[in-house]
């Protein structure tokens, strides 16, 4: 008998697909349709806000094609809670206009394929690994516009039988599979849950993305990995667009959804999502985050990118490129979570915030150590960080016009960023940026410049810098350049107050600079506001 990897289970998952009886809907009197929309919205709001349970996550999607019209996805701590959520929907007037063409039941799972030591002696595992594993067992639906779902199994045929292979060979294939997923860091978030004994396939795979073609691309590319090409068997695929509960009526009227630009994430009782979870993994062993966990930060996983270290087929990553620096940006990072992380990291002289429109957290530390000394230390940390699926990037940046270096560490989850902060705070010669004067700081993260325009970009920065020195409330602005990629930069700016910075962002000079930048940047700038 082949060796069986140990597993541990977490939250249960229900994909509840619904088809609308459009003939009955059109023929129903207005008051009945209004009642159906009303209690349908109430049901969806209640479950997205987790009013029905102590913990969990829920979301609703408009499914394209003939296979279904609506998908309601629930993550809950118990199977009973899932059953209750499903049955409560049937009590609504809206349910009378729908049928359930299919559904899928599974449970979040971790296995010992790539972290056998964790199962052998979990008490000896570092805190980061323990938090990461817990995150995989309690995934949350991320703030992404689209979701794809499909079930899959590992082949048990006469020629190719996954379960006959030695465990080392299985682990090796999954590790290789995970490397493919790393390419989708910042694009795909995936949740994988085991359905062995629960449903018709062995795993249910849910992929979340802001660009639906990323879902297509990652599935396509991973088909060529040996673990999928020889051993993967796939079920029916579904694709849907997320919408807020309040837009149920608009959906049924054939209107565009969402009806207004908004954050579709409902408040939940659980924090940041931590990635996929499953045991014998239908996919690669690390899903992009590497396969082993070093002694690293861990609130969630950090691996050079895409996803967790346990078996993953796709990327558990997130982060989209959005960045209009308008006044609305200021509200993005004044929410409770950002305030909490900034307060906690302030003790380490680390400045943290969340880029506007992105599901990543950036922590920034300033140091007066030499670049060689700092880079050597960061390389060591990064080697450990890269074992975690929620690690997006850690790099050293050097100020262009003065002796000041910055270490920027970007993570998919707040908990991972907080844990990583404890490590980077121990870097040499950390200085408190607040020493320049307390006030409001803003960073334009990830100005990736086309190489042929790098000199022109530097000249433009000098011109804008001259304008800044004349502005009320401006303290200091530095152009920070990545030691490993001179086209990767960020602008760090310190102001007396938020309103002083916003005055500049509303100015014609800033608008003209942004417009000019569209031609010289290889991607749109993404801004982080740090109060």
From Swiss-Prot:
Annotated ABM domain residues: 441-529
Protein name: Putative heme-binding protein HQ_1094A
Start-end of Low complexity biased regions: 318-338
Pfam families named in the record: ABM (PF03992), Chlor_dismutase (PF06778)
Organism: Haloquadratum walsbyi (strain DSM 16790 / HBSQ001)
Composition bias, Basic and acidic residues: 271-281, 308-317
Binding-site list for heme: 177
Family listed: In the N-terminal section; belongs to the ChdC family.
Biased composition annotated in UniProt, kind: Gly residues: 284-306
Molecular function, one GO term: oxidoreductase activity
Stretches for region Disordered: 269-340
Entries under SUPFAM superfamilies matching the protein: Dimeric alpha+beta barrel
Taxonomic superkingdom: Archaea
Entry-linked InterPro entries: ABM_dom, ChdC/CLD, Dimeric_a/b-barrel
Organism phylogeny: Archaea, Methanobacteriati, Methanobacteriota, Stenosarchaea group, Halobacteria
Assigned keywords, A-Z: Heme, Iron, Metal-binding
